[in-house]
Amino acid sequence: MRISVLSLHTSPAAQPGQGDAGGMNVYVDQSVRALAAAGHVVDVFTADPSGIDGLGGRAGTLQIVENVRLHQLPIDAANKDELADAIDELALLLLDEPGFTSADLIWAHYWISAEAALRAQELRSQESLSAVAEDATRSGARPRIVVSMHTIGAVKNRDSETSHERPQRLEAEERIASAVDLIVANTPAERRDLIHELGADADAVVVARPGVDHDLFSPGDRAEARTVLGLAREEFVVLYVGRMQFIKGTDVVVDAISGLREDNPHLASRTRGILLGAVSGQEAPTGFSPYLRELNSAIAAEPSVEVRRPVPAHELVTYYRAADILLVPSRSESFGLVAAEASASGLPAIASAVGGLPDIVEHGYSGVLIADHNPRHWAMALERMLLDDELRRELALHAADRSTRFDWSATAASVLGALDVPDLAPTTTMTTTEQMTGTEETTTAEEMSNTEETATAEELNPKPRLVGRGC
């Protein structure tokens, strides 16, 4: 099968943890590799304003792996909001791409991509824009459109008092939910939100769990990892991985470690908090928001906390192996990439009981869930876990064992299986001509930097959870 994957506002080749790059980038990267491994031909399209490393800021094509090409569309947009205002232009650009117009299936990630896909389909039905479109119209064929929202505007507004998503997005997501052929939810919690918040037809929503790259994310030697990272063997390491955002709860991490210092100064003196991430979205070019200014002041005032740059996956696993505890204090989270990666690496998490996180972290078994974002409760949970070596070892073992059920090939198979299209058999290879189609310059993945793989995971059938304050 020929599959067109849209990740328009952010490239799957971008470094997670900064700008608009996060778990979705990893999801797209890993899922298209799984589709290709299953014998499908995949064309991925992005209009990421930051461009694709290896193309020097130009529009063009990058060969990721066999049967997977990444295309940078030529659009003049400085950020995600400008892309959202250019849906018609994006649709027309897609209709100029053979990898889009010849697709049997379109898988759109995020609402901007879904809007562009639906608009392109509308334009194709109005008039024949190419020979490919004419053939499709005459034969009655129409590519199925699948969407993964990843985040839902209404849910972000519900879960965070500082979130004010644009009305354009809220209206578009409701429209998308009723127009596409299939909606992919990462967790049962997200499925409920899609149905209740967007009015999606329950029969059109499938839960397809993201996977974990177990060849990369696995338990390892802590002492060796700390030597690599320049960390002392005798200190406790508390890790946060992600963008510096209110919705991600970065402030809770800093405040919890400061609270630990008040409650147990000796323990705090032996604890190092590492924030592995950078600012998000438009923060860097426009100047820091009041939230980031306050966060920066709090970090400067807390001697146990340091900030390090985001790192590619092959380095990130070393941080997971070196740390004692991962903190995931998200205020809204449709899935929870880092909690799943950490679990596979044998690192237990203290996480918020929101969104998809309870599907990854089983309270009292593979980690700890906290029902609110009161730093005092997080400090209490942190102190208890740091003081109990046996508890951490037990949680780590369970976390690693629990993560084995997550697999990217199963993710891809779940989505394709939900479509139930037996006549769309795998296309075994991309021809040489197809690999060089168009006037774009094609570059191999080896010629670009930061195309490392990361992954995430959750269980398929969540059980009721005991959610605690602190522990």
State the predicted function of each range:
Residues M1-E66, V467-C471:
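N-terminal subdomain of nucleotide-sugar transferases
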Residues A189, G211:
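Carbohydrate-associated surface elements
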Residues G277, G287-H314:
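Nucleotide-activated donor-binding/catalytic signature segment of Leloir-type glycosyltransferases, i.e.
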Residues P310, T318-A323:
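Short alpha-helical donor nucleotide-sugar binding micro-motif in glycosyltransferases
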Residues R331:
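Aromatic "clamp/platform" in nucleotide-sugar-dependent glycosyltransferases that forms part
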Residues P348-A351, V361:
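Short hydrophobic beta-strand element within catalytic cores of glycosyltransferases
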Residues H363-G364, V368-P375, R384-E390:
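Conserved acidic donor-binding segment of nucleotide-sugar-dependent glycosyltransferases
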Residues H377, L391-R405:
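A short, well-ordered alpha-helix in the C-terminal region of glycosyltransferases
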